[in-house]
Amino acid sequence: MAVQQNKKSRSARDMRRSHDALSENALSVEKTTGEVHLRHHVSPEGVYRGRKVVDKGADE
């Protein structure tokens, strides 16, 4: 089992943990359809930034 050489201070521990926080997903509302989707992703209807970029039946 690993044993530490020197005790880490509370400050060092907290500075290490400062990057561990989770953030919520950034969601956007499509202007034309009103659908909610992830930022910089195509909506389920195939619309991105107000333009139809993917035909719904194309992937089938």
UniProtKB/Swiss-Prot annotation:
This is Large ribosomal subunit protein bL32. Pfam families: Ribosomal_L32p (PF01783). InterPro entries: Ribosomal_bL32, Ribosomal_bL32_bact, Ribosomal_zn-bd. Belongs to the bacterial ribosomal protein bL32 family. It comes from Pseudomonas putida (strain ATCC 47054 / DSM 6125 / CFBP 8728 / NCIMB 11950 / KT2440). The gene is rpmF. Residues 11-22 have a biased composition (Basic and acidic residues). The keyword Ribonucleoprotein applies. One of its GO terms (biological process) is translation. Residues 1-60 are annotated as: Disordered. One of its GO terms (molecular function) is structural constituent of ribosome.
